[in-house]
Every structure is written in structure tokens, then in C-alpha cells.
């Protein structure tokens, strides 16, 4: 039986994570699927707001694309935190904010400039 349903999007570098969060009652508790795989198979790093807040009664279905594993993990973390924010109490929301789960890291790849080989790598300078 499903009580609540939330959707959220998280971004980090080139990664985009779209999640669907379901509130459940004991049946199949705490299942997190990422692109059809279990979360612990897909990600090696555990940066999960559920573990941080000790919440167990939510099922999460995640579709993530682009970037590498760390960027995807950060995008998933942000998306889950945004979905949890919509129904948690203010005390727990403040806890999420204090530990940086709700802030988006806006740093991304710098663009290549003309006259240079990469974003900042210049050709070798010859004085004569």
C-alpha cells in the first residue's frame, strides 16, 4: 500500500538523476533501485541521506545518466534529499542543510578557449 509519492531531480557535473520516492508500510521496505540494479551494486560509495537520517520505510526508483560514478552519486544524493525535504519536519530539514545534502555543487567542466589546447593549457611559449 502506497501512502506518499514524490519526484525530484538532482544534478552534479554532467550527471542528472530523476527519482521517484514511495512511502510504504513494512512490505519491501527500504529498496533503492538505480537503473534497474540495487544501489549497493551500482554505487561503491554510500552517501545516502536515508542512512544519515535513519529512515527505512521508503522505496526509491532512480534513473540516472551522464557523468561518472561519483557525479552520479552526488546527483542521487541531492535528488533524494530534495524529495525528503517535501515532507520531513523542520528539525530534520535543518539537519540535512547543515550537513550539505540540500546544496547543489555548481562546479562543472570549464569550456575550451580558442588559441589554447584545453581550457587552460597553452601551447609552449618560445621567446625566439
Swiss-Prot record:
InterPro entries: Ribosomal_Su5_D2-typ_SF, Ribosomal_uS9, Ribosomal_uS9_bac/plastid, Ribosomal_uS9_CS, Ribsml_uS5_D2-typ_fold_subgr. Gene3D superfamilies: 3.30.230.10. One of its GO terms (cellular component) is small ribosomal subunit. GO terms for biological process: translation. The keyword Ribonucleoprotein applies. GO terms for molecular function: RNA binding; structural constituent of ribosome. It is found in: Plastid. The keyword Repressor does not apply. Keywords: Plastid, Ribonucleoprotein, Ribosomal protein. Belongs to the universal ribosomal protein uS9 family. This is Small ribosomal subunit protein uS9c. The gene is rps9.
Amino acid at each position: 500500500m502506497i501512502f506518499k509519492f514524490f519526484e525530484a531531480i538532482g544534478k552534479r557535473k554532467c550527471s542528472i538523476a530523476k527519482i521517484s520516492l514511495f512511502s510504504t508500510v513494512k512490505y519491501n521496505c527500504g529498496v533503492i533501485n538505480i537503473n534497474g540494479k540495487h544501489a549497493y551494486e551500482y554505487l561503491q560509495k554510500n552517501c545516502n541521506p536515508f542512512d544519515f537520517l535513519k529512515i527505512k520505510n521508503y522505496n526509491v526508483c532512480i534513473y540516472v545518466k551522464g557523468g561518472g560514478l561519483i557525479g552520479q552519486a552526488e546527483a542521487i544524493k541531492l535528488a533524494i534529499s530534495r524529495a525528503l525535504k517535501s515532507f520531513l519536519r523542520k528539525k530534520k530539514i535543518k539537519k540535512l542543510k547543515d550537513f550539505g545534502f540540500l546544496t547543489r555543487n555548481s562546479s562543472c567542466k570549464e569550456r575550451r578557449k580558442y588559441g589554447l589546447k584545453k581550457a587552460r593549457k597553452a601551447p609552449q611559449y618560445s621567446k625566439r
